[in-house]
A protein has these predicted regions:
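Conserved beta-strand scaffold positions in the cores of enzyme catalytic domains, especially
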Residues: 30, 89, 155-159
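Hydrophobic anchor at the beta1->P-loop junction of P-loop NTPases
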Residues: 7
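Conserved substrate/cofactor phosphate-moiety recognition/catalytic segment
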Residues: 20, 24-64
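NTP-dependent small-molecule kinase module
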Residues: 2, 25, 130-160
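Walker A/P-loop
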Residues: 16
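A glycine- and Lys/Arg-enriched "phosphate-lid" helix/loop adjacent to the NTP-binding pocket
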Residues: 93-141
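Glycine-rich phosphate-binding loop used to anchor ATP phosphates in small-molecule kinases
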Residues: 52-97
Length: 160
């Protein structure tokens, strides 16, 4: 059975960077949960999700061949299907101002003027930034649900 390290936290906290670094250091494959949540065959990115069953099936199929793996991201609606596969869980946190800046810079780097005022992704980008600002309260994902998930896990836990 595959066993892995799961890195959670708000967008812009550095999950992907840490996940890739740890995977590289350990020689494990890295899986970004976003790749299993959002359909890529859409005109506007990050607008259409796979169904819960598709998320679980696609990710399960990809990690199956590996004894160990590193995974990062938010899987609030389907983590139950993977909880027994984690040997370690890392909660990574960054202050809201730092996160918002990182998320905005990343979006501009990926999508250019599309996320700036007048662009076709501007409104969805603003909603995403607002949701990230609300991580400590009622965003999706949010601090309380991720802490609860981590507290209910029986694996090793680290907070950074």
């Amino acid at each position: 059975m595959s066993k892995g390290i799961m890195i959670i936290g708000p967008s812009g906290s550095g999950k992907t960077s840490l996940g890739k670094m740890v995977a590289d250091k350990l020689g494990y494959p890295y899986f970004d949960v976003d790749d299993y949540i959002w359909r890529r065959d859409t005109e506007k990115p990050y607008t259409v999700m796979y169904s819960r069953e598709e998320k679980i099936n696609r990710l399960s199929k990809d990690i199956f061949p590996y004894e160990h793996f590193v995974m990062a991201g938010s899987m609030s609606s389907f983590h139950y299907a993977f909880d027994d596969k984690f040997d370690m869980m890392v909660f990574l946190y960054a202050e809201p101002a730092v996160r918002i800046q990182r998320v905005h810079e990343r979006a501009v780097e990926r999508f250019g003027e599309r996320v700036l005022e007048g662009g076709d992704l501007y409104e969805s980008h603003l909603r995403f930034l607002d949701d990230n600002r609300r991580y400590e309260k009622n965003g999706s994902p949010n601090l309380n649900e991720q802490r609860e998930w981590m507290n209910n896990m029986s694996c090793m836990k680290i907070e950074l």
